[in-house]
Design a protein with these regions (language model features):
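Short, small/polar-rich motifs associated with maturation and membrane association
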Residues: 1-215, 220-222, 227-229, 235, ...
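Extracellular/periplasmic, surface-exposed regions of secreted and cell-surface proteins
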Residues: 6, 211, 217-226, 232-236, ...
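Conserved small-residue
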Residues: 65-156, 414, 421-430, 656-746, ...
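A subset of solvent-exposed loop/turn segments in beta-rich extracellular surface proteins, enriched
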Residues: 80, 87-102, 275-297, 345-369
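Outer-membrane beta-barrel transmembrane strand signature
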Residues: 121, 126-183, 188-194, 267-319, ...
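Low-complexity intrinsically disordered tracts that form flexible linkers/tails across taxa
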Residues: 239-260, 678-682, 885
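Extracytoplasmic gating/loop element in the C-terminal half of outer-membrane beta-barrel translocons
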Residues: 295, 349-353, 358-360, 772-872
Length: 918
């Protein structure tokens, strides 16, 4: 569960972390799910295996091919975030101000804390709202002052930065791919040579991607029974990352915060101070500017990443006798990634850091962080090798060749050595490659107290200087065999033993045996079966055991620590424990049973029905510990889970003539899982369940969502929840796990796709629909914190409770008008009750038109007098249409299902391309 649930990718018989970026390199893709098919691939096969075969050269088939595609995506639609507009946020701040919250705090913010333009206006009037501290009563503002304040606020309401964001910060994402290949061969040599380029940019202004790849695949027939294979590739990436915080900063812009004024001059956003406070420190004392403008940040960004990836693979195939082959393969990979981020002294982040550690002395300002640029440098190096030695027997025997045997045995060893280093240089000069030293110990222990703060600000230089060295080694032994009699009865079996150094020195925990057994019955080939309408009929069954483990380093049988080179007290070194020891760490294991029926009708319809049941045990989960032992939580083997379902796959040629075909493909899946054991202790089960941090609740789905039972708003506009006995409470602190409601699972129970394709002569059209049903998700509620609004406020604040009686027509809580009540009760879980209530749950059912694809092959007669043998033109649309069951039309795939946070949906995208064969 926590060891990962991604499938295993196998490319040309070797395990890889990612799929090839250029799909034109791929010859075929096969998905393996049943136990007999996946057990042979080892520990990560518990989540399924995707086997990819890339293109090779063919004898006497010389070919030059070129392909390209260009993809353009629409700009992001920020309406998907459902943020409040300027008027809604300002009205919200104004109401909180009139209730006295601003006055109670002496202003929405304090010097150096940061506040918005609307709060900056309201801060000018905080003394005009008088609070009776004995009764909590708030006096109304003087009408003249109120009118003056409203006039300033109304002017601000008219501003909206949406168009400026779209014009200056966003663009249509673009990506292009080009590939050229030469392939062919003779009776002794086959070759496939290719080169490709990928370039483009994201939807955010400032970044740029460039990637180059060359590949050589050659096989040499050294002897009549001995073949040498080589596969060499190199990839070079050179990327400009731009201003990497741009998307996050856009999210955090208040809608009335403009980027430029009417004359086109850039406007600074004073996120730390009001303009008045900022001017005081810059003009009177000489501090660096406290303003920030995203256009400036984009212009100053100097953040690059360079990646190189070299792979060399060599293999030998030796045919001992007819049907018996030996093979040996070795792959070596060297990968390096270097990131260099030079942050200008004029960028906001550098100015902020320098200002925080600048003190006013008798002789002016003293800079404890040197004035200059900052260099953040990181480098990752990976050296990996894989060796495989195996034997394969593939024979038919018997008088009528009725017996068929395919057996494979082999050995595999893998090693992956990863080193990383990162460091920061302050006062950096890229021209002279120089930097300035700092008093790191004093900055970390004593820090600096700037004049706008009563607390010291500390700078931990050691947190930027990191080094790591990780070595993973795995060894595997495997054996598999398939026997078929008369093309009717088949039995198969496999055994694999995996060992990993991640489990310490004890062979008891290092070794992971994996096995499978399967049987097939091809009924169609039985002599008694006489039905011409049924073109295929086969029964299949398999069972097996697979395993998985956490490769991320979050758990270990031995203690893992990080050496800190400088102690803050005496300057010496010390060891920080990063992973506590888990001497009982074991592999995650999965027992699988698969039953399938393959049915073909009239040589036009093919369908497969599969039932599977998987039992996972010793699954890794977060266990909360007694803090007195030194750790609050640890990843341990703590849970068992059942996972079962049904899959149906149908392909049908409804119409099939020489010039016209119409085919339909349908995939349907039903899946449900249930935790059947959990030995981990949960010290805060109520909050952890509703927040989704507790996944192992016995008797329920791993992806279950828990909620407070919604009881509506009370007469003061406060959210309420039901206890199990029906009583109402206004704070989660009065609730236990028995009071919670199980809302369902965010993992779809029913999912699949429907595809249909038409071909008329050389023109093809395909449509792909995907669907998900039987799941739920949570939607975002406004955070009703009256002490200053956030740019991420949900637009539903406009529907909040405002007066008695509103509780009958809205479910959005009020800004509590009684400060005393707020301080005593409302702030303790008021927004929590609403956000994580059953009222925030929506159905996740959806149908999406994922893809429309058109392809046209030029008739060969048009190319008869040209060197081009084939020319194909493709056009494709993605993310075309969406239907959802929830009434608001929220895209379930663009919402965090547990927290309800909205994200941007995938925009519609258009792709076109050309393929040519010479």
């Amino acid at each position: 569960m926590n060891a990962g649930n991604d499938p295993l990718f196998i490319v040309d018989d070797f395990e890889v972390e990612e799929l090839p970026e250029n799909m034109d390199m791929i010859e075929s893709i096969t998905v393996l799910k049943d136990a007999s098919a996946t057990a042979i691939w080892g520990s990560r096969a518990a989540n399924g295996v995707i086997v990819i075969t890339t293109k090779k050269g063919k004898a006497n088939d010389f070919k030059i091919s070129y392909s390209n595609n260009f993809k353009v995506s629409a700009k992001p639609n920020f309406d998907d975030l459902h943020r409040a507009n300027s008027e809604q946020i300002i009205d919200y701040d104004r109401e909180a101000h009139l209730y006295g919250y601003n006055s109670m705090m002496g202003g929405f913010g304090y010097e150096g804390s940061g506040y918005s333009l609307s709060q900056e206006i309201l801060n000018d009037y905080w003394e005009d709202v008088i609070i009776d501290w004995e009764t909590g009563a708030v006096s109304p503002m003087d009408p003249q002052k109120l009118a003056e304040m409203d006039a300033r606020l109304n002017k601000l309401k008219a501003y909206s930065n949406r168009k400026q964001i779209e014009d200056y910060l966003l663009r249509n994402a673009f990506r292009q791919q080009h590939m050229i290949s030469v392939s062919g061969g003779t009776d002794r040599v086959n070759y496939f040579l290719s080169g490709s380029f990928i370039g483009g940019h994201s939807e955010y202004v400032g970044d740029q991607e460039r990637s180059y790849n060359i590949n050589s695949r050659i096989s040499y027939k050294l002897l009549h029974n001995l073949t040498l294979r080589s596969d060499l590739s190199a990839t070079f990436d050179n990327n400009d990352n731009g201003y990497t915080n741009l998307s996050n900063d856009i999210y955090n812009l208040f809608p009335f915060q403009m980027l430029v004024d009417e004359a086109g001059n850039r406007i600074a956003d004073y996120t730390q101070f009001s303009r008045m406070d900022a001017d005081k420190y810059t003009q009177e004392y000489g501090y660096l500017s406290f303003g920030k403008n995203l256009l400036d940040e984009i212009d100053m960004a100097n953040n690059t990443t360079k990646n190189t990836d070299y792979k060399a693979r060599f293999g030998l195939d030796y045919r001992v006798i007819e049907g018996l082959n030996l093979s040996a393969d070795y792959q070596y990979e060297r990968y390096q990634s270097i990131n260099k981020d030079i942050q200008s002294i004029n960028s906001y982040g550098v100015r902020e850091l320098i200002n925080q550690h600048t003190v006013i002395g008798e002789n002016g300002l003293s800079y404890r962080i040197p004035k200059g640029d900052i260099l953040d440098h990181s480098q990752t190096d990976v050296e990996a090798w894989t060796m495989k030695i195996g034997a394969t027997l593939n024979r038919n025997f018997g008088a009528d060749k009725q017996h068929y045997v395919n057996a494979t045995a082999g050995f595999e060893a893998r090693s992956k050595h990863t080193t990383t280093e990162s460091y920061r240089k302050l006062g950096y000069n890229d021209q002279t490659l120089s930097w300035s030293p700092i008093d790191a110990i004093d900055l970390a222990t004593n820090g600096t107290t700037p004049p706008w703060s009563s607390n010291p600000m500390r700078y931990y230089a050691s947190s930027y200087d990191k080094f790591s060295d990780i070595l993973n080694r795995e060894i595997s032994y495997y054996l598999s065999a398939v026997y078929t009699y008369d093309n009717r009865y088949t039995v198969s079996g496999s055994l694999r033993i995996d060992k990993s150094n991640l489990f310490g020195v004890s062979d008891k925990y290092r070794r992971n045996p994996i096995w499978s057994f399967g049987a097939n019955w091809n009924i169609k080939n039985e002599k008694f079966f006489k039905c011409d309408a049924i073109s295929a009929l086969m029964l299949r069954a398999s069972l097996g055991l697979t395993g998985n483990f956490d490769r991320s380093g979050r758990t270990s049988p031995i203690m893992v620590g990080q050496f800190i080179s400088s102690d803050l007290v005496d300057g010496g070194g010390y060891m920080r424990i990063t992973t506590p020891p888990n001497p009982l760490l074991r592999w995650e294991r999965t027992r699988s049973i698969n039953l399938s029926v393959d049915l073909g009708l009239f040589d036009r319809i093919n369908t497969t029905l599969t039932y599977y049941h998987n039992k996972g045990y010793d699954l890794l989960g977060e266990a909360q510990l007694d803090p007195t032992v030194g750790y609050s939580e640890q990843l341990i083997n703590s849970a068992d889970m059942n996972n079962s379902g049904v899959e149906v796959q149908l392909d049908a040629d409804l119409i099939r003539t020489r010039d016209f075909t119409w085919n339909v493909g349908w995939v349907f899946g039903y899946n449900e899982n249930k935790i059947i054991r959990n030995s981990a202790h949960d010290s805060s089960p109520v909050l952890n369940r509703v927040h989704g941090t507790t996944r192992f609740v016995e008797g329920y789905s791993r992806e279950g969502i828990w909620s407070y039972r919604w009881a509506g708003l009370n007469e003061m506009g406060l959210p309420q929840a039901y206890k199990a006995d029906g009583t109402k409470v206004t704070t989660y602190e009065d609730l236990t796990v028995e009071d919670l409601e199980y809302s369902g699972t965010y993992q779809p129970k029913y999912s699949g796709s429907l595809s249909t394709g038409f071909r008329y002569k050389n023109l093809q059209a395909n449509f792909l629909f995907t669907y998900n049903f039987g799941h739920v998700f949570r939607v975002e509620y406004p955070d009703m914190n009256p002490f200053g609004s956030s740019p991420a406020l949900n637009e539903r604040i406009a529907d909040r409770w405002r007066q008695p009686g509103d509780e009958a027509k809205t479910d959005v809580p009020a800004i509590c008008s009684d400060m005393m009540n707020y301080l005593m009760t409302y702030q303790t879980g008021a927004s929590e009750l609403a956000q994580y209530s059953s009222n925030s749950i929506r159905k996740g059912d959806m149908i999406r038109l994922r893809e429309i694809l058109l392809n046209y092959d030029l008739p060969k007669k048009w190319l008869r007098n040209s060197p081009v043998k084939r020319l194909s033109i493709t056009a494709q649309l993605n993310n075309v249409w969406l239907w959802t069951a929830n009434k608001e039309g929220y895209d379930p795939e663009a919402v965090s299902p547990v927290s309800g946070t909205f994200s941007l949906t995938d925009p519609i995208a258009f792709t076109c391309g050309v393929k040519l064969d010479f």
